[in-house]
């Protein structure tokens, strides 16, 4: 799951490394595995409505990279896992960043459930599911945050430790520390504002696709105009 607005080097590294870890599991058969890039409608809302052009740009870019894209209206991860469990009883893997995992352990997302957070986590982790966690760099301290040192709400700490110590959360240990400061929202802002430098934040070939298809509001004249002013 991601915003993919646009897809970045971080997104693809997270995917590639999580896939390697998933396939190394003896319970996983690679030929029977389906990889899906999911975008939730909850992350496509702009000023209270769906921005269709923005949504299509994200999906088109991922599809051009050969990926399968699924659009859902599941804001909570447990609903997503519950949906997939209708089609398979085999092991499932979720690749995500630290920030998203911390959100999973936020009680406010489960207030509408009669069983609260316990019901949600029962649905999420009852299935044969494993989370592959990509690290986060603290921009203030420079500290690399992993499953070992991330902080959840005190009331959720023991629940988190339970899933961590039972092997349901695995750290992605192979990563490029030089790209941890790349964020989709920053790249998107640079594209819209006609700034230079966003191309290096994206996987090889992605910048050319954005330029050729004028995705995410890319405007060649705006970019060229910015360069002339700088000169």
Set out the residue ranges of the language-model regions.
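Nucleotidyltransferase catalytic core that binds NTPs
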Residues: 1-231
